C-alpha cells in the first residue's frame, strides 16, 4: 500500500515555480561543501553579492543557519527566504484608521411602506428581532398590518484601534465645532465696538467733544483736571471698570483703560519668598525645599505681626510639636533614672507612662498644698474675692443710658450660648425642654408643658402634683371590680382547683426526676473514682520500673474530661501543703 502511495505522489504534476521533489536528498560532496562555505565567507566579507529572496530583498549573510533555514512544511522548495521569520499576514489584526469614528446625529429619513421578510414582527425594523424590540408590543404586529413600520436603527461600526488610536484624544473631533466659539468671540467684539461707537456719537451730539477740542488747554496738549468733561469721562471709565467683568469671555481680560483685549494672561500678585528681601545677608532660602525659616524682614525693623510673611519657623511650633518635645524630654529624664522607655521603640508605653506621671505630679502638688494649709492655715485668704470687688472700684469706664443699656465701656455679662435655646421668656428661670415627663417637654421651674405660658414657680408644681393625685384616684375607682354572680364565682373556683392539681403533678414529676438524676450522678462519680484509683496505681507501678525499661505511654487524650472525672481527680489529688495529708495517708 505504501508503494502505491509513493507512485501516486510521483505521478502527480508539479508546477514550474513550486516544484516539490519528494526524492531522497543527495549527499553533498566534499568539494560542494567546500565551495558553499567559501561562498558564505565571501558574502560575509562583502566580496560576493548577497542572496536574494523571492521578493527581491537581500538576505543578511551574518544571520545564523537555524534562523535562515526554511522548515519543510512551509516551503519544500528550500529557496532562500526569510518570509517565515516575518509576521504572517493572516495572523495580523486589522485596526481601524485614525479618521474613522462613530456616526453621530444620524437622521431617520428613510420611510418604509411595506413589511420586509426577516424584519421585526412587532415594529417592522430590519435591525432586530421581535424578542429584542424596545417598542411597546402592538396588539397586531407590523407583519400582519403592514402599516406604521418603524425605520431601521443606525448600527454603529465596530471600531478596533491600535495602541496609538486608543490614546488619540483628538480622534472623532470635528474642527468645525471650533468655529462656533470663534463666532461667539466675534459677536462679543462687535457688540463692544458698537457700544463704543454709540457712546462717541452721543458725546458728539451733546457737544462734549467739541467743547473739549476748543478748550485752550486742550489745544496746547494740557488737560483740565477739574473740568466737568473729565469728571464725566472718569465716571464713564469707572462704570466700564465696574461692568467689565460682565462683558468678559473666558480666556480673555478686557482692559477698559487701554481699550485692548489681552488673552490668556495670568496675573500673579503674590511675591516669592526670595524676592521679599534682596539683601544676600538676610534670611536663607533653600531652593530645593523652597523653605525660608527665618524672617526676611528681621533686619528691616518691622514688627513680625504686621508683615504678611515672617518665615516658616512658626510651622515648627504648631500642632503636636510642643507635646512631642515634652514627651521626648520626659523619656530622656526617665532613662537617666533607670526606666527603659524610648520614644521610637515604645511610643505607646511612653505615652501611658507620661500621662500617669502628670496625674501623679498634680496629685502630689495638691497634697503638698493641702498639707501646708493644714499645718499653717490660711485657707480663708485663698477663698477671698478678687481685688476689684474688695476695693469696690475699677478703672473700667462704663457709660449707661437712662434705660440701663451700656453706651460706652465693657459690660460684664453672664456668658450665655449664642443659640436661641438659652433665651428665657415669660419670667421662666429654666429653658424650654429642661423638664420631661410622660413623653412631653416642659419647664423645670414650674413643670408647665405649654411653651408660651408664664412661670408660676412652686405653686405651679403643687397644682400639677394635685391634679395627678386626682387622676390616680379616679383611675383607682374605675379599677374596682364589679359584683360577680354565683355562676361566675363557681367557674373561677373550678379553674383555681385545676391549676392547683397541675402544680402538684409538676412538683411530683420534678421530685422523682431529681432523685433519679442524683442516683445517676452518684453512680458516675463512683465509676470515675474507681478509674482514677486504677490510673494512680498504674502510674505508681510505672514509676517503680527503670526509666530505660518503661513502655511507651502517651498522656494525650482526644476527648475532654467529664465533670465526674474532674471531681474524682480533685478528691484523689495529693496536697503536700496540707498538714492533714499525712494523717489521711495513714
UniProtKB/Swiss-Prot annotation:
Residues 20-44, 529-550, 557-578 have a biased composition (Basic and acidic residues). A motif (Bipartite nuclear localization signal) lies at residues 129-169. Residues 1-63, 77-100, 206-254, 491-586 are annotated as: Disordered. The gene is SLU7. Component of pre-catalytic, catalytic and post-catalytic spliceosomes. Associates with the spliceosome prior to recognition of the 3'-splice site for step II, probably during catalysis of step I. It is found in: Nucleus; Nucleus speckle; Cytoplasm. Residues 235-248 have a biased composition (Acidic residues). GO terms for molecular function: pre-mRNA 3'-splice site binding; zinc ion binding. Its main location: nucleus. Required for pre-mRNA splicing as component of the spliceosome. Participates in the second catalytic step of pre-mRNA splicing, when the free hydroxyl group of exon I attacks the 3'-splice site to generate spliced mRNA and the excised lariat intron. Required for holding exon 1 properly in the spliceosome and for correct AG identification when more than one possible AG exists in 3'-splicing site region. May be involved in the activation of proximal AG. Probably also involved in alternative splicing regulation. There is a cross-link at residues 349, 408 (Glycyl lysine isopeptide (Lys-Gly) (interchain with G-Cter in SUMO2)). GO terms for cellular component: cytoplasm; nuclear speck; nucleus; spliceosomal complex. The modification N-acetylserine is found at residue 2. Signal peptide: none annotated. A zinc finger (CCHC-type) spans 118-135. Belongs to the SLU7 family. One of its GO terms (biological process) is cellular response to heat. The modification Phosphoserine is found at residues 215, 227, 235. This is Pre-mRNA-splicing factor SLU7. Keywords: Acetylation, Cytoplasm, Isopeptide bond, Metal-binding, mRNA processing, mRNA splicing, Nucleus, Phosphoprotein, Spliceosome, Ubl conjugation, Zinc, Zinc-finger. Pfam families: Slu7 (PF11708). Residues 498-510 have a biased composition (Basic residues). The CCHC-type zinc finger is required to retain the protein within the nucleus and prevent its shuttle back to the cytoplasm via the CRM1 pathway.
Amino acid at each position: 500500500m505504501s508503494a502505491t502511495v509513493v507512485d501516486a505522489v510521483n505521478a502527480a504534476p508539479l508546477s514550474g515555480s513550486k516544484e516539490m521533489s519528494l526524492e531522497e536528498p543527495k549527499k553533498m560532496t566534499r568539494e560542494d561543501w567546500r565551495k558553499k562555505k567559501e561562498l558564505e565567507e565571501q558574502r560575509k566579507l562583502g566580496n560576493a553579492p548577497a542572496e536574494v529572496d523571492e521578493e527581491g530583498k537581500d538576505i543578511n549573510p551574518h544571520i545564523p543557519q537555524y534562523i535562515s533555514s526554511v522548515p519543510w512544511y512551509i516551503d519544500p522548495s528550500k529557496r532562500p527566504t526569510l518570509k517565515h521569520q516575518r509576521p504572517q499576514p493572516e495572523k495580523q489584526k486589522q485596526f481601524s484608521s485614525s479618521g474613522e469614528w462613530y456616526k453621530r446625529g444620524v437622521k431617520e429619513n428613510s420611510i418604509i411602506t411595506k413589511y420586509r421578510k426577516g424584519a421585526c414582527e412587532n415594529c417592522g425594523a430590519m435591525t432586530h428581532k421581535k424578542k429584542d424590540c424596545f417598542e411597546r408590543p402592538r396588539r397586531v404586529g407590523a407583519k400582519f398590518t403592514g402599516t406604521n413600520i418603524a425605520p431601521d436603527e443606525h448600527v454603529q461600526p465596530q471600531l478596533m484601534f491600535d495602541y496609538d488610536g486608543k490614546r488619540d484624544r483628538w480622534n472623532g473631533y470635528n474642527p468645525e465645532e471650533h468655529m462656533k466659539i470663534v463666532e461667539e468671540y466675534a459677536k462679543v467684539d462687535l457688540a463692544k465696538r458698537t457700544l463704543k461707537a454709540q457712546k462717541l456719537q452721543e458725546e458728539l451730539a451733546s457737544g462734549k467733544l467739541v467743547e473739549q477740542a476748543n478748550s485752550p488747554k486742550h489745544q496746547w496738549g494740557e488737560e483740565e483736571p477739574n473740568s466737568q468733561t473729565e469728571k464725566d469721562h472718569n465716571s464713564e471709565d469707572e462704570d466700564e471698570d465696574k461692568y467689565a467683568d460682565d462683558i468678559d469671555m473666558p480666556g480673555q481680560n478686557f482692559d477698559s483703560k487701554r481699550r485692548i483685549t489681552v488673552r490668556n494672561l495670568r496675573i500673579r500678585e503674590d511675591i516669592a519668598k526670595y524676592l521679599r528681601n534682596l539683601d544676600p545677608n538676610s534670611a536663607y532660602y533653600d531652593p530645593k525645599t523652597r523653605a525660608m525659616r527665618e524672617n526676611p524682614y528681621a533686619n528691616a525693623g518691622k514688627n513680625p505681626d504686621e508683615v504678611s510673611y515672617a518665615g516658616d519657623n512658626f510651622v515648627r511650633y504648631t500642632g503636636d510639636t510642643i507635646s512631642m518635645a515634652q514627651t521626648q524630654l520626659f523619656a530622656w529624664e526617665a532613662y537617666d533614672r533607670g526606666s527603659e522607655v524610648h520614644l521610637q521603640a515604645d511610643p505607646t508605653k511612653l505615652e501611658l507612662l507620661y500621662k500617669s506621671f502628670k496625674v501623679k505630679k498634680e496629685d502630689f502638688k495638691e497634697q503638698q498644698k493641702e498639707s501646708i494649709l493644714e499645718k499653717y492655715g490660711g485657707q480663708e485668704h485663698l477663698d477671698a474675692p478678687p481685688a476689684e470687688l474688695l476695693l469696690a472700684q475699677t478703672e473700667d469706664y462704663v457709660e449707661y443710658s437712662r434705660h440701663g443699656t451700656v453706651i460706652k465701656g465693657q459690660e460684664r455679662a453672664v456668658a450665655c450660648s449664642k443659640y436661641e435655646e438659652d433665651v428665657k421668656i415669660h419670667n421662666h428661670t429654666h429653658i424650654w425642654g429642661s423638664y420631661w415627663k410622660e413623653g412631653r417637654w416642659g419647664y423645670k421651674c414650674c413643670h408647665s408643658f405649654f411653651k408660651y405660658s408664664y412661670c408660676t414657680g412652686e405653686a405651679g408644681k403643687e397644682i400639677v402634683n394635685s391634679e395627678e393625685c386626682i387622676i390616680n384616684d379616679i383611675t383607682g375607682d374605675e379599677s374596682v371590680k364589679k359584683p360577680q354572680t354565683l355562676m361566675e364565682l363557681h367557674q373561677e373556683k373550678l379553674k383555681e382547683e385545676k391549676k392547683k392539681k397541675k402544680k402538684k403533678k409538676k412538683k411530683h414529676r420534678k421530685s422523682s426526676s431529681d432523685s433519679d438524676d442524683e442516683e445517676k450522678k452518684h453512680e458516675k462519680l463512683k465509676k470515675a473514682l474507681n478509674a482514677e484509683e486504677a490510673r494512680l496505681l498504674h502510674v505508681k507501678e510505672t514509676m517503680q520500673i527503670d526509666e530505660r525499661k518503661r513502655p511507651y505511654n502517651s498522656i494525650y487524650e482526644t476527648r475532654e474530661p467529664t465533670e465526674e472525672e474532674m471531681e474524682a481527680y480533685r478528691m484523689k489529688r495529693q496536697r503536700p501543703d496540707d498538714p492533714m495529708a499525712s494523717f489521711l495517708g495513714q
